[in-house]
Amino acid sequence: MKRADLAGRKVSVIGAGRSGNAAVELLLCHGARVLLSEKGALDPDTALRFRQRGAEVESEGHSDRVFDADFAVVSPGVPPGVPVIRELERRQIPVHSEIELASWFCRARIAGITGTDGKTTTATLVQRMAEAVGRLGGYRAYGVGNIGVPFSSKVEEMEERDIAVVELSSYQLERCSSFRPEAALITNITPDHLDRYGGDIMRYADAKYRIAMNLGSSGTLVYNADDPILRARFSVGGLQFSTVPFSTAGPVGGDPSSGIYLEDGWVHAGLRRLIHTSEFQKGSFRGNHNNSNVLGAIGLARALRLDEKAVLQALREFPGVEHRQEFVASKRGSDWINDSKATNVNAMRQALEAVPGRIVLIAGGRDKGNDYSAVATLVREKADLVVAMGESRQKVADAFRADVAVVEAATLEDAVRLAAGGAGTGRTVLFSPGCASFDLFRDFEDRGRSFKAEVGRLEA
């Protein structure tokens, strides 16, 4: 769709979160007639601002006005099966994601990143790499999408030489049809959000694969060859785009001349050694999962033809990401680690593997069909205490109580208090929920900030 095509078009925006509000702003800028429809309460200042600019606004439910539209834009948090979406589809009204909308107006080069785990870390790292190169080349790099900054809120600033590093969830990709990155990366596929996909991991994987559907012959897909689902899907021939596999387990397919891989502590691009892990594994940025994130980031940077020297220097300087195995403080003889970004069991497993020594694990939140058997051995081997918290505390407690001491906490405040009481000296308290945050918090960031605040209140 072209910019001029929006003038006078009727558009319903479903959901007034960050993405929905940014979509409204972009649509209004291009002359669309907008209805913002929110099923819950709406901030009065936001509603007033949009009304003053000519938008219609409704809250506390969706009226039939939603269906008087040329198309709709849906926020990623709105489930696909809710009545308002089903009715839009029944009436054959096109439904797009905010990412799709923003892509119509994007002049910049687009790098797309999706996967179950490592998306935010990898997207942040690639954005830092592109930013470092851009300082030399006179262009800018933007980190947008699921990383927390709506694509629509930045797209008007972007120019042709800029790079938009777009992190994409499966929710956002579901409603993309023409989104076309220059290069894309899939970090991995493990069980997550299966409540949304009828318990079928392949339906979930299909949503992730949509990142590559428009790559075309000039596009490149970087994928994790250590992931059996991705390897089976993309190691075959006959694809319309080129592929770059990466692996932490040595040369991909036994061929040292291709792919990005880790061998003897060195990152290789084909036969070339690029950088040793000792140059970037430090502080909170450690563990084999971060080696995987680095390989994917380097693969994507190479697909974008970014200057190698600047890319590797940006990697050396990368501090890690807030809420992902983030060191918070030493209190009462124990280190406290914030891993609120761990919203599934695989991310919890990665944290358990990365954190050395004995631990107290705080886990729980809103369950997403979790199977804790994947971490049962690690918890038994490393944890002296599990504090099961939030909405899923009973399920978490039942999963681990046969192997380790377990206590339950309804709130995060109680969980921190119980962890502090049970940690003693020399243990690490790891907050790695393995669940969604929506039982008690707005999002994982809100949850992580709350955890850090509670730790800050503890006496040293």
Swiss-Prot record:
The keyword Nucleotide-binding applies. GO terms for cellular component: cytoplasm. HAMAP family: MurD. Its main location: cytoplasm. Belongs to the MurCDEF family. The keyword DNA-binding does not apply. Keywords: ATP-binding, Cell cycle, Cell division, Cell shape, Cell wall biogenesis/degradation, Cytoplasm, Ligase, Nucleotide-binding, Peptidoglycan synthesis. Its EC number is 6.3.2.9. ATP binds at residues 115-121. GO terms for molecular function: ATP binding; UDP-N-acetylmuramoylalanine-D-glutamate ligase activity. InterPro entries: Mur-like_cat_sf, Mur_ligase_C, Mur_ligase_C_dom_sf, Mur_ligase_cen, MurD. SUPFAM superfamilies: MurCD N-terminal domain, MurD-like peptide ligases, catalytic domain, MurD-like peptide ligases, peptide-binding domain. It is found in: Cytoplasm. This is UDP-N-acetylmuramoylalanine--D-glutamate ligase. Cell wall formation. Catalyzes the addition of glutamate to the nucleotide precursor UDP-N-acetylmuramoyl-L-alanine (UMA). It is an enzyme of class 6 (ligase). Gene3D superfamilies: Mur ligase, C-terminal domain, Mur-like, catalytic domain, NAD(P)-binding Rossmann-like Domain. It catalyses: UDP-N-acetyl-alpha-D-muramoyl-L-alanine + D-glutamate + ATP = UDP-N-acetyl-alpha-D-muramoyl-L-alanyl-D-glutamate + ADP + phosphate + H(+). It comes from the Bacteria. Pathway: Cell wall biogenesis; peptidoglycan biosynthesis. Pfam families: Mur_ligase_C, Mur_ligase_M, MurD_N. One of its GO terms (biological process) is regulation of cell shape.
